From Swiss-Prot:
Function as written in the Swiss-Prot or TrEMBL entry: Binds directly to 23S ribosomal RNA and is necessary for the in vitro assembly process of the 50S ribosomal subunit. It is not involved in the protein synthesizing functions of that subunit.
InterPro entries linked: Ribosomal_bL20, RIBOSOMAL_L20_CS, Ribosomal_protein_bL20_C
Gene3D superfamilies associated with the record: 6.10.160.10, Ribosomal protein L20
Gene giving rise to this polypeptide: rpl20
Protein name: Large ribosomal subunit protein bL20c
Location relative to the cell: Plastid, Chloroplast
One Gene Ontology molecular-function label: structural constituent of ribosome
One Pfam family, short name: Ribosomal_L20
UniProt similarity note: Belongs to the bacterial ribosomal protein bL20 family.
A GO BP entry: translation
Lineage: superkingdom: Eukaryota
GO annotations of cellular component type: chloroplast; chloroplast envelope; chloroplast stroma; plastid; ribonucleoprotein complex; ribosome
Sorted UniProt keywords: Chloroplast, Plastid, Ribonucleoprotein, Ribosomal protein, RNA-binding, rRNA-binding
Amino acid sequence: MTRIKRGYIARRRRTKLRLFASSFRGAHSRLTRTMTQQRIRALVSAHRDRGKRKRDFRRLWITRINAVIHEMGVFYSYNEFIHNLYKKQLLLNRKILAQIALLNRSCLYTISNDIKK
């Protein structure tokens, strides 16, 4: 039987893994088996938190819009504001509205007064 030389393929795979896990602490950056486990865990966390980041930012935008609207008047709520926006067919998403609320409140006041009518 001929001798099988399998030199660099496994080494190349482990080197890639080592580069990925080089910033991990302790054995998680030294031992191959724990490196693979931590790599899977890191990728799972990254995938989960990409979705969570979208939810968190949407919640932040809604909170900012709601805070500025409540300063304007007590009887006007966030959901009425969004409902009136859709009724008037204004294409402003929550991210843009939050930026307007943060940087230019008078502009948001005029928008809300226009859609109230």
